[in-house]
Every structure is written in structure tokens, then in C-alpha cells.
Amino acid sequence: MAKKDYYEILGVSKTAEEREIKKAYKRLAMKFHPDRNQEQDAEARFKEIKEAYEILTDAQKRAAYDQYGHAAFEQGGMGGGGGFGGGAEFSDIFGDVFGDIFGGGRRQRASRGSDLRYNMELSLEEAVRGVTKEIRIPTLEECGVCHGSGAKPGSSPVTCPTCHGQGQVQMRQGFFTVQQACPHCHGRGQIIKDPCNSCHGHGRVEKAKTLSVKIPAGVDTGDRIRLAGEGEAGEHGAPAGDLYVQVQVKAHPIFEREGNNLYCEVPINFAMAALGGEIEVPTLDGRVKLKVPAETQTGKLFRMRGKGVKSVRGGSQGDLLCRVVVETPVNLNDKQKQLLKELEESLGGPSGDKNSPRSKSFFDGVKKFFDDLTR
């Protein structure tokens, strides 16, 4: 596959000055550096950007690239390198130009520990009021014997004989010598000659640890709580990662939650719906009385202010909304059936206009619909 044009990679023109090239490089390197960008192709993009920068900020290499393209840096290109002598060494531009942003340098930094995730199920009551829970998680912790160094107590890591402590080695690439992470010490500049017997030189050991996690009042499904430094220990003394507790609130048999409001259905019999009355309804703080006005229809919402969930960020508290459901009586005895028939007759039948305005409106609409069809 053909290599992409270096100028296109950095988004600069072929006449761009070194100042413009450096500016473009810093912007793109910040965007695609693997420490900051977790996308799958970020590392490949970053290497591509770095390579383009290295060529275009070296006057000789840029001139060769402008004349011969990528062929100038392939083995055997330009007839053995006429005009470049025995080859020019790269300076470590990553450390010079980019080090101030990411704390870079010649040695590769030990890797920060991985972040961990823990899924925590809560009841609605726990989520609303807040709770402290103990959790147990498998993780990698700093070795207590060598304190993360990887070396046996009484010994120390030694300077890598391959890179002489630089963390990088020079490799031939076409006409030029480039610097890469040392394959022996993996860029650290040091090796463990006498490894710790407990962690076998890794500086970390597998353990299960118990943590006490305080869940604030008002959390909801999808909320995430970060415990800084409670992830896996870093390599060779590097900082630990973080632990993220992911909240999942279980379904409740009575209440449903929407934001900071709670909803519940309250069944009432049709006599109370017609005549009105008072009932007890549940809240998370206990029972409260609700006045039901006469002529209440199914679906009517009654709002009880301040009986919902307090915002996890502080401030106002949500409401409890009770949705009334008028229940049709079942298992009627003969007397009850007779009374209902008498009531129906007194109401003027199913479509009585005075006592059932919605029924009258519905049946009037049905009659008009069929009348229109027969015209």
C-alpha cells in the first residue's frame, strides 16, 4: 500500500515553514497520542505523524523527500545515498519537542496501572438515600516485598547493557539512523538481574482487596463513581489506575423513577372515584394521606411535592406522582349485581348524557360516523 504524503499527514503545504510544521505536529500529536486517545488506530496515526515531522523538520531529509518522495528513505534509494555521506543520525525529536507536553524523554516511562470497573446493583431505597457498601475486587497490587521495583531486596535494577541506560537504540532505516525503544529493557534503561522471588521481577502481585465504597444519595442507573488510585498498581512504581463503580438500580415493585421524580399507580374503587374520599399512599418516607376529589377519572395524576428523589448534585428534591386507576369490581354477589343494574338505569344506561359525558360524546361520535357512511 502506498505511503501517505508527509505534507498531507501534517495538513501543511509543501512551502510550509518549520514553525508551521512544528505547530501542526504538536496539535496532531496531542490529539492522537496513545496516552490520551484510546481509539484503535490512534497509535498508528501517532507514528505516522511523528515520522512525517522527523522528515520535514530536517533540511537534508526534506530536500531528499521533495525530490525523490518516499524512495529516498528506502534501502538502496538514490544510488547508495549520494550527497548524504555515510548517513545522518536522527536527534530524539520526540523528547525535544513533545517531552514538555507529556513529560517524555529518552527513557520510556513505566506504564500507569489499568483502570478497573465494578458493577454495583442497588435497591431504589439505597440509591435514593445513599449507602456505604463493601466490595471485593481482584486486582494487581504493588509487591510488598520489593515495593514495586521488581528486584530482590538488597539488590537494585542495573543499567541495560544494550542501550547503556538510554532506553533507546539506533536502527538503520534507509540512509538514516533512527532511534527506537530498546528491545532488551523495553525502553526503561534498566533491567532486573536478580528478580524478586515474590513477584518474579514484575513489581506487582495478584490480590483480592476489599474496599468500602460510599454511594451518595440520589444516584441513578448509569451513574459512575470514580475511586482515584484504587485500580491496578502501575509497573515498577508507576501510578495506580482508578476504580470506576458503575451503578445499576434494581426495579422496584411500587415505584418507577424518571429523573428525580417517582411515579406509582394507586387503585381506587369506582365508588370512591365518583364520590371522593381519602386513601393512604406509600412514599419512601412512609405512608401519607391523599385526598381524592369526587368525579376522579382513571389516569389522573396527583403530585406530592418533595416526596421524590433529592438530586445527587444537591439542590431541589423531586416529587411523587400518583396515577389513579379506577378498578372495576369483580366477584359480585347477586345483591351487588342488582344494585349496579339499578344504578345503571338511574344513570340513563351506558350512554347517559348527564352522568357520563365522555360516554355520551363517544356514542354520539359513533352514531355520526355510521350515519355518514350510509349517506
UniProtKB/Swiss-Prot annotation:
Similarity-based family: Belongs to the DnaJ family.
GO MF term set: ATP binding; heat shock protein binding; unfolded protein binding; zinc ion binding
InterPro entries documented for this protein: DnaJ, DnaJ_C, DnaJ_domain, DnaJ_domain_CS, HSP40/DnaJ_pept-bd, HSP_DnaJ_Cys-rich_dom, HSP_DnaJ_Cys-rich_dom_sf, J_dom_sf
UniProt CXXCXGXG motif repeat ranges: 143-150, 160-167, 182-189, 196-203
Protein name: Chaperone protein DnaJ
Subunit structure: Homodimer.
Residues at which Zn(2+) 2 binds: 160, 163, 182, 185
Source species: Serratia proteamaculans (strain 568)
Keywords: Chaperone, Cytoplasm, DNA replication, Metal-binding, Repeat, Stress response, Zinc, Zinc-finger
HAMAP family: DnaJ
Compartment(s) where it occurs, according to its Swiss-Prot or TrEMBL record: Cytoplasm
Domain-related comment: The J domain is necessary and sufficient to stimulate DnaK ATPase activity. Zinc center 1 plays an important role in the autonomous, DnaK-independent chaperone activity of DnaJ. Zinc center 2 is essential for interaction with DnaK and for DnaJ activity.
Pfam families: DnaJ, DnaJ_C, DnaJ_CXXCXGXG
PROSITE patterns cross-referenced by the UniProt entry: DNAJ_1, DNAJ_2, ZF_CR
GO aspect biological process, one term: chaperone cofactor-dependent protein refolding
Zinc finger residue ranges, CR-type: 130-208
Binding positions (Zn(2+) 1): 143, 146, 196, 199
